[in-house]
Regions:
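Juxtamembrane "helix-exit" motif on the non-cytosolic side of transmembrane helices
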Residues: 87-91
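Single conserved hydrophobic/aromatic residue that forms the stacking wall/gate
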Residues: 1-6, 10-13
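Hydrophobic alpha-helical segments of polytopic membrane proteins
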Residues: 14-86, 165-166, 173, 181
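Long extracytoplasmic/lumenal interhelical loops at the membrane interface
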Residues: 93-148
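Transmembrane alpha-helices of multi-pass inner-membrane enzymes
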Residues: 178-183, 194-219
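Membrane-interface catalytic loops of GT-C/OST-like multi-pass glycosylation enzymes that act
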Residues: 40-44, 136, 189-200
Length: 219
């Protein structure tokens, strides 16, 4: 829990100070991140940390709005990757085996659930789902799919995608950078669906109240 809170605080810090971020900021925070990695050996945290900086650099260097549209692809790519590896994992396949190893066995666990229980269109109760327990589903995309069903998962991701498209049209790139960072986190952790841990989920509110956000952005 401490690690997750720390990671979320780092993401929020970069968001609130986005316009001030520079090479010195990147260098100092990267050094701190590497020190923490040596102490905790947490690959997830350090991977997401540097991925965030890559997206920040991309946003600050690239000026073309068309090229920046790739930021909208982060959640769809994360969802597609998670679903593909869950459905087609094979321990005898060198690449899939390596991916599973890099994510500490998460793919194997999800594939085991899929083979044992399959996927459902509608939500399932915990009693049904935990009839056979194979481990923690540490992947936000597949957690919502297994628990809530395909229909709810599709609706959820469509809402997020529409939110990202709205942010893109408004040129809210720093918000897209943070969502992109959490999109990778979603492949490796399940907390991303928690609104208390991931405040960027609240951005979906612009679909209901677009005028307020657009007015603030124009100012």
């Amino acid at each position: 829990t401490t690690r997750l809170v720390g990671s979320e605080m780092c993401i929020r810090d970069r968001y609130y100070n986005y316009e001030k971020l520079n090479v010195l900021w990147c260098g100092v925070t990267s050094l701190i991140a590497l020190v923490f990695y040596k102490m905790t050996f947490c690959r997830t945290g350090v991977l997401v940390f540097f991925f965030c900086w890559v997206l920040i650099l991309f946003d600050k260097v690239v000026k073309s709005k068309n090229i920046k549209s790739v930021l909208v692809c982060s959640v769809p790519v994360g969802a597609a990757f998670s679903l593909f590896t869950t459905l087609f994992y094979n321990g005898n396949h060198a690449l899939l085996y390596k991916i599973n190893h890099l994510v500490s066995g998460r793919v194997y666990i999800m594939n085991t659930y899929y083979k044992d229980q399959g996927l459902s269109l509608f939500p399932r109760t915990q009693e049904i789902f935990y009839t056979s327990y194979h481990g923690l589903i540490d992947n936000s995309y597949m957690q919502v799919t297994f628990y809530a069903g395909i229909l709810v998962a599709v609706l959820f991701f469509v809402i997020i995608l529409k939110t990202m498209l709205r942010l893109y049209r408004m040129e809210c790139y720093k918000e897209l950078v943070m969502i992109g960072t959490l999109a990778l986190y979603g492949v490796l952790e399940q907390f991303v669906l928690n609104g208390f841990m991931n405040i960027f989920l609240l951005l979906c509110g612009i679909l209901l109240y677009p005028g307020i956000v657009e007015e603030k952005h124009e100012k």
